[in-house]
Amino acid sequence: MSNPPHGGVLKDLIARDLPRHAELEAEAETLPALLLSERQLCDLELILNGGFSPLEGFMNQEDYNDVVKENRLASGLLFSMPITLDVSEETISELGLKAGARITLRDFRDDRNLAILTVDDVYKPDKALEAKEVFGGDEEHPAVKFLYETAKEYYVGGKLEAVNKLQHYDFVDLRYSPAEIRTHFDKLGWSRVVAFQTRNPMHRAHRELTVRAARSHHANVLIHPVVGLTKPGDIDHFTRVRVYKALLPRYPNGMAVLGLLPLAMRMGGPREAIWHAIIRKNHGATHFIVGRDHAGPGKNSKGVDFYGPYDAQYAVEKYRDELGIEVVPFQMMTYLPDSDEYAPVDQIPKGVRTLNISGTELRARLRSGREIPEWFSYPEVVKVLRESHPPRSQQGFTVLFTGYPNSGKDQIARALQVTLNQQGGRSVSLFLGENIRHELSSELGYNREDRDKNIARIAFVASELTRSGAAVIAAPIAPFEKARQNARELVEKYGDFYLVHVATPLEYCEKTDKRGIYAKARAGEIENFTGVNDPYETPAKPDLVVDCEKQSVRSIVHQIILLLESQGLLDRF
């Protein structure tokens, strides 16, 4: 018999509303519709299938306020994470959102009707309070950045009626709903289940940790990785799931099963650990492993941890009686080479020799093709990782030039393209400012909003080419720091990004202008001209600073080649 769900009843809205499917589908076609984002789809799926029980919809203002301030729903039941549907003021007006209104929620990928929302209320959240109480308030925290930069200004609360399941086309056999995994446990005869949350590949230490947890609690293991949204820069879920499948035979026969969780993580540390425990309880687990820095986003730009290493364990311990799932705290596992075994760090006697490979070191070994020892990971796991992580000389990268008009960006970019093409080994794509404006952004103007859109489009194309192993060279003006930083973050999901500030002085750019564009701008014939009547924000942290007044194009290209070579991106001779 699996663990009762949070609140006592599994809120499986898919099963509840299935008898009314035809009626709801017909009504959904007649209602105003809202296309959901990827994060909203993740939340919706886990509301509809009962993963977020006792929720039956997106939180209204009363529930939201109590969760933010007290870790509880208005009913008093423990719940630590706000589950909200954010909308803009424009959307409120377009869809007629008000109490009692009904709207269809659709999948942005295929326009499929997923649910009908009956609006309870529309409210403006206190984002500063949410950021502080739920995530700690650090503006560099990814969830706080999402609140301020991405989430719309209003939330809509209300109950849901399920119309259709979300369609998935990958690893369908592993995507158990809470009801399905509970049935699977019953079929296997499992009554005690330890759930293990992860957003990373698993290695020998993780296998040892989960087996120890199962052994000490006389339980079986549910490997329950997140395949929704995780931390930017994480290894993609396709690779990770192949790793988990490769690892599974290393468990004693019948000990472990693999199930995938379509969760949009918030990286919320202590609050998230409580939330994760509730979700695993809803999936029938009786025990839940909480490790060091559980669901933490790491460090901020000053090198300070967002959360303490064991804050998450303290949080779940505080609410253990209410959670209804036994939390299994675990220290980091470390390898002891002299005895060829793993042990928790707090159980290793002083003076005993230990070995460990950090995540940073593992990524470095994958990039360089260096050996990953068998004491750290299994050969079949390493094989999967190497398939998705070719050596540095085969990885894509982007070089983005920024500077005033006529600063020499285009000449440097063209020369760099020729140099890389001469070397060979990967395709090279060149995007010059005027070409991009003509081919990709012809309808955009030169105000700040349109300039940012132009850089965002360049970054999107560059990220896709980088992902496929190409070298991308882009030379827009890119005058604004935020747009440049957003471009870096997008491209770095898939490969290296190098910002080159072509810091040729404005006076020199104007003096050597043979096309007369500066003169026209000075005469008022060209509006929003960077350096004359529109600002240029000097890059805060460029990877390279060059100056065409003092340096030749050839010497600048050589500097860039040396930079790329030092990072292992070019073949060494």
Swiss-Prot record:
For this record, the Gene Ontology CC terms, alphabetical, are:
cytoplasm
Q: Where is this region: Catalytic?
A: 170-394
Keyword Iron-sulfur annotated: no
Site Induces change in substrate recognition on ATP binding: which residues?
A: F330
The chemistry this enzyme catalyses reads: sulfate + ATP + H(+) = adenosine 5'-phosphosulfate + diphosphate
N-terminal, as annotated region: 1-169
- Name the domain of life: Eukaryota
Cell compartments where the protein resides: Cytoplasm
Spell out the InterPro entries in the cross-references: APS_kinase, ATP-Sase_PUA-like_dom, P-loop_NTPase, PUA-like_sf, Rossmann-like_a/b/a_fold, Sulf_adenylyltr_euk, Sulf_AdTrans/APS_kinase, Sulfurylase_cat_dom
Instruction: Keywords in alphabetical order, please.
Output: Allosteric enzyme, Amino-acid biosynthesis, ATP-binding, Cysteine biosynthesis, Cytoplasm, Methionine biosynthesis, Nucleotide-binding, Nucleotidyltransferase, Transferase
Q: In which pathway does it act?
A: Sulfur metabolism; hydrogen sulfide biosynthesis; sulfite from sulfate: step 1/3
Molecular-function GO terms, alphabetical: adenylylsulfate kinase activity; ATP binding; sulfate adenylyltransferase (ATP) activity
Q: Which E.C. number(s) belong to this protein?
A: 2.7.7.4
Query: According to its UniProt record, which residues of this chain constitute the active site?
Result: T198, R199, N200
Report residues binding ATP: Q197, T198, R199, N200, G291, R292, D293, H294, M333
Region entry Allosteric regulation domain: which residue ranges?
395-573
- Indicate the annotated site residue(s) for Transition state stabilizer: H203, H206
Which GO BP terms, alphabetically? cysteine biosynthetic process; hydrogen sulfide biosynthetic process; methionine biosynthetic process; sulfate assimilation, phosphoadenylyl sulfate reduction by phosphoadenylyl-sulfate reductase (thioredoxin)
Which leading EC class covers this enzyme?
transferase
Annotated control of activity: Allosterically inhibited by 3'-phosphoadenosine 5'-phosphosulfate (PAPS).
| Sequence positions that bind 3'-phosphoadenylyl sulfate | E434, N435, I436, R437, R451, I477, A478, R515
**HAMAP family on file:** Sulf_adenylyltr_euk
- Chain's role: Catalyzes the first intracellular reaction of sulfate assimilation, forming adenosine-5'-phosphosulfate (APS) from inorganic sulfate and ATP. Plays an important role in sulfate activation as a component of the biosynthesis pathway of sulfur-containing amino acids.
Recorded domain comment: The adenylyl-sulfate kinase (APS kinase) is non-functional. It is involved in allosteric regulation by PAPS. PAPS binding induces a large rotational rearrangement of domains lowering the substrate affinity of the enzyme.
Record-given protein name: Sulfate adenylyltransferase
Task: Please name the source species.
Answer: Neurospora crassa (strain ATCC 24698 / 74-OR23-1A / CBS 708.71 / DSM 1257 / FGSC 987)
